[in-house]
Amino acid sequence: MSPWEAKWIRHSEVRPFPQPEPITVEEKVAVMLKPEIHVKNGCHPYPAVNDLGETNSGLKTKGAPSGMCKGSGWGSQVYGRHALFKGVWAIMYSWYFPKDMPSTDFGHRHDWEHVIVWIEKPVVENVKILAVTPSAHDGYSKQVPPNPGHLNGLAAKINYESKWPINHALEPTGLGGEKQDLILWEQLSSNARHALNIVHWGDANTPFNDYVFMGKLEKAFPL
């Protein structure tokens, strides 16, 4: 497949990237702070793209909100990207969902949601979490500093939920959730990065690609 061609494959056929062994301090910190996601309703996270750059075709808004999307047999994925922003370190963690469906015929194919964890600096010991900002309907909720009850150690606990008839969003929670294999932007294959930069996901958009990542940090900046 040419890297310049977009190719969609069935939502259940996309294989995630295995989580690489972290080498740099930034990679180690990103793994340490990997959040937990609790799915209250709707789809569970799925891989969005494979190493060839083939992308998840998603699902129509038919059947039950969690119909055909209660988890991939190949395993799931959380995508990460980090940057120094206005003097602090930001790590964005993002999940893809095949559909965003409050109820039958509501919502849309594809959903991207993300949470940004803000820390003083990337250090392996004594990491200081300054804020947690989950995405919600083109905006963010902001916890500065995070509620200790919304953390499991260093992992932010995040709830994914649709409050009918509104589409899904993320929010902090006291409920435990699941973690997925983390793949950072620079660890993705070039084909996967290219696909995430150019593929149009309808009413959803990839929040960590080259075109929108810094704008998301600007919008979410909590300090």
From Swiss-Prot:
<comment type="similarity">
    <text>Belongs to the Necrosis inducing protein (NPP1) family.</text>
</comment>
<dbReference type="Pfam" id="PF05630">
    <property type="entry name" value="NPP1"/>
</dbReference>
<dbReference type="InterPro" id="IPR008701">
    <property type="entry name" value="NPP1"/>
</dbReference>
<keyword id="KW-0964">Secreted</keyword>
<dbReference type="GO" id="GO:0005576">
    <property type="term" value="C:extracellular region"/>
</dbReference>
<comment type="function">
    <text>Probable secreted effector that may act as a pathogen-associated molecular pattern (PAMP) recognized by the plant immune system. Seems not to induce necrosis, neither in several susceptible or resistant Vitis species nor in the dicot model plant Nicotiana benthamiana.</text>
</comment>
<dbReference type="GO" id="GO:0030430">
    <property type="term" value="C:host cell cytoplasm"/>
</dbReference>
<keyword id="KW-1035">Host cytoplasm</keyword>
<feature type="short sequence motif" description="Conserved undecapeptide motif">
    <location>
        <begin position="90"/>
        <end position="100"/>
    </location>
</feature>
<feature type="short sequence motif" description="Conserved p motif">
    <location>
        <begin position="107"/>
        <end position="113"/>
    </location>
</feature>
<keyword id="KW-0843">Virulence</keyword>
<protein>
    <recommendedName>
        <fullName>NLP effector protein 2</fullName>
    </recommendedName>
</protein>
